[in-house]
């Protein structure tokens, strides 16, 4: 699979290159040349894999369609290292909670920082560490946050070899909880920088650095926000997992105790058993910059 810039640069790039680059040299976003098409047989196979082997196996199957420059065995180990009950609190990783007849809540906030962004950031941290070790390189991650992005990124990158994080945040304009999450980290590779101003001032600094290609290349600067295709790709997986659970009609595995349902909800569904792949499911997504919804759009483009 090759990737091209949305601004017209037709130079094909491989996944591991765009993972470390973030933005294309012309300022565009990297997208795959095409979206792999999933037929009914593949959906049936993925449903079975998710039921029998769990979320990490499903993630490997989907990521493999877009990543062909990491050996399959290595990619599978990365997925298995990332999506564990120890990190996300449940066997299902994204357990579904039934709120009413045909109405469910997919729990995406059971990760280390209690934000859905853990789902992709935890994978990014392991992908970065793997690829940087393979190349013998280091990466300086520069980001801007008003809360959950910074926390999720720092908890995913803390202690990772070859990675240093410099996270800008507006001074006095974050929630006390998320500020405590970030500023309490003592890892040597995590650097929090409070900026006098608002979030847009922080973001403007990051954009200015990203647009200075010579500076960016000299100091090996990368990104972890939703402009990085790897983050969006990781989020595609939980749309498939949610679909399989919502359309399951067989007894489920019990959700882990740490994944508490909302008040008034019935017990969790857990991983799916048998089900049908011709049912339609509507996903309603609270969204800020639309990256989360975009991942759902990619899943639908693939045939979900």
Model regions and ranges:
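PLP-dependent amino-acid enzyme catalytic core
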Residues: 1-259, 267, 276-304
